[in-house]
């Protein structure tokens, strides 16, 4: 089996409870501490086996880390781990997992190889919002429920709000409209992407 580690909880004696996003499900497993075990961390893609035990959760064994081309790039790995960490609270209560999430991460790993990491993640997140039906291309203001036709702001989940309805950073309407339609950040400057990134980190 293969999957991405989206949550790690330490338990007694350096053992871990690990949550893995696989193709069709979220897997929670127990990882015993051992000197010969490979290191694991948030965001790692691993190949693994599960061993059923008398406990409530299976034991994680035969773990092999599947590296990324950029895994030693501090900035890319740091941003990747911050993004991956958001998937656990977002998906933890879902019983049947859509393969979309696994393959979205698979594609993102490849894109990050070639592109600025924050831009790549923001573009991937737009696709996630669209898949979940949460991408508000109607541009109705969250607060006053009137359609936005000029400058706007964005809040958590990239929800659009009239600039006059909030004190948040103002974006050019046409730029955000293009972002939502084309799912590309090439027309946005670095400061705008940085602000989108800060919004994204508030939660998926």
Segment roles from a protein language model:
Residues 1-14, 21-204:
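Non-catalytic alpha-helical scaffolds and adjoining flexible linkers that form interface surfaces
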């Amino acid at each position: 089996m293969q999957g991405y580690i989206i949550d790690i909880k330490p338990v007694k004696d350096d053992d871990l409870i690990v949550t893995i996003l696989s193709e069709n499900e979220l897997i929670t497993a127990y990882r015993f501490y051992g000197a010969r075990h490979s290191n694991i961390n948030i965001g790692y893609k691993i190949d693994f086996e599960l061993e059923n035990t008398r406990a409530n959760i299976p034991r994680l064994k035969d773990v092999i880390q599947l590296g990324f081309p950029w895994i030693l790039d501090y900035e890319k790995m740091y941003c990747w781990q911050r993004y991956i960490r958001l998937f656990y609270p977002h998906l933890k209560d879902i019983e049947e997992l859509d393969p979309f999430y696994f393959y979205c991460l698979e594609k993102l790993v490849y894109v990050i190889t070639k592109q600025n990491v924050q831009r790549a993640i923001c573009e991937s997140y737009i696709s996630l919002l669209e898949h979940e039906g949460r991408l508000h291309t109607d541009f109705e203001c969250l607060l006053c429920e009137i359609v936005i036709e000029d400058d706007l702001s964005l809040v958590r989940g990239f929800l659009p709000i009239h600039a006059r309805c909030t004190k948040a950073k103002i974006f050019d309407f046409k730029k955000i409209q293009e972002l939502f339609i084309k799912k590309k950040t090439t027309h946005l400057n670095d400061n705008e992407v940085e602000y989108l990134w800060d919004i994204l980190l508030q939660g998926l």
